[in-house]
């Protein structure tokens, strides 16, 4: 009953995508194990995708600004640089697109505007950059924005060396075309969307055996590493630090798939855990000494960091009249915009 309840809650139709003969999902338990394997792959994939998204959008934006500043220095006298650079449109990627020239990009921007307004955030370049999707930035990496197209926005090839300094042909050493780079990014965006919609990462119509499925996942991840290198090789070190590459290596194996297929068999014997955080949460309390007391509040010096905390009468167990100067107390700290942080739930020791 437990396995059936899980598969029904995950959607029978969606679950059927894991019932591939090639993966050996002969039973509901094994199919659930394949689902769990995909969940772990998605989790290991996420840091690489996040690095690509953040580094790509920042590289495109900053490269455009740097190019415009460079043009100012080439075309104006030094005493005019500050004035002319101030005229550079910091929202160039927002103001460029209209309903007429690029409806999809314009629609993405309108969605970002609505989100920022809803969150009561200013419409700054930084906030727009964080709200626009990976797909928006990927759509800029194509020959439509090449100088030869003479379109409403020109990005390439003059920004290529800034955005993708290491995107070169491994044989000739010559820079890769923007279309070649863009095609790789489009494939990565498809993987990101597949992951966000909880779909299998291994789709491969030409797969004959399970090894082909696993190799497809490896190819997807390798593509991510390649693009990260193109933009900034140093970011690859981040994946090593958090052991993402190690996790992917462990998961992309026949043994990992087999192991996950066995896991659900023991589910019926497991207890449902409803108190996970118990024993995990870290005690945030401080101890300290009351160093000043009035009719309405106290000041407490923390033993932990020697900071001074403000405690109101309403935060004191039993009321302020039950406390005295130099009393030892326990309290929960809380940040405040006032002179002192707050002390909450104040109790005598």
Question: What do these predicted ranges mean?
Answer:
Residues 263-273:
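A general sequence property marking short-to-moderate contiguous segments
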Residues 334-349:
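OB-fold/S1-family single-stranded nucleic acid-binding modules
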């Amino acid at each position: 009953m437990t396995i059936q309840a899980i598969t029904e809650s995950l959607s029978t139709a969606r679950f059927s995508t894991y019932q591939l003969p090639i993966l050996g999902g002969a039973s509901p338990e094994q199919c659930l194990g394949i689902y769990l394997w995909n969940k772990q792959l998605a989790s290991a994939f996420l840091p690489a995708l996040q690095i690509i998204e953040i580094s790509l959008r920042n590289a495109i934006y900053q490269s455009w600004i740097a190019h415009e500043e460079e043009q100012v220095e080439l075309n104006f006298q030094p005493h005019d640089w500050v004035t002319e650079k101030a005229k550079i449109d910091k929202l160039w990627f927002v103001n460029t697109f209209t309903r007429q020239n690029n409806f999809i990009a314009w629609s993405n921007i309108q969605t970002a505007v609505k989100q920022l307004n809803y969150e009561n955030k200013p419409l700054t370049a930084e906030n727009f950059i964080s709200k626009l999707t990976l797909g928006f930035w990927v759509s800029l990496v194509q020959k439509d924005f090449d100088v030869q197209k003479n379109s409403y926005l020109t990005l390439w090839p003059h920004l290529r060396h800034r955005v993708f300094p290491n995107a070169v042909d491994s044989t000739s050493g010559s820079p890769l075309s923007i279309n070649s780079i863009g095609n790789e990014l489009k494939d990565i965006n498809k993987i990101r969307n597949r992951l966000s919609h909880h779909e299998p990462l291994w789709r491969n119509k030409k797969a004959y055996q399970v090894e082909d499925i696993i190799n497809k996942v490896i190819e997807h991840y390798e593509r991510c590493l390649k693009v990260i290198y193109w933009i900034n090789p140093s970011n690859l070190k981040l994946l090593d630090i958090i052991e993402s590459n190690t996790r992917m290596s462990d998961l992309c194996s026949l043994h990992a798939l087999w192991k996950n297929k066995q896991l659900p068999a023991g589910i019926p014997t497991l207890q449902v855990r409803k108190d996970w955080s118990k024993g995990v949460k870290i005690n945030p309390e401080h101890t300290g000494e009351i160093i000043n007391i009035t009719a309405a509040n106290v000041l407490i010096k923390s033993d932990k960091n020697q900071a001074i905390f403000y405690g109101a009468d309403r935060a004191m167990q039993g009321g302020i009249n039950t406390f005295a100067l130099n009393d030892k107390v326990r309290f929960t700290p809380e940040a405040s915009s006032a002179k002192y942080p707050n002390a909450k739930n104040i109790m005598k020791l």
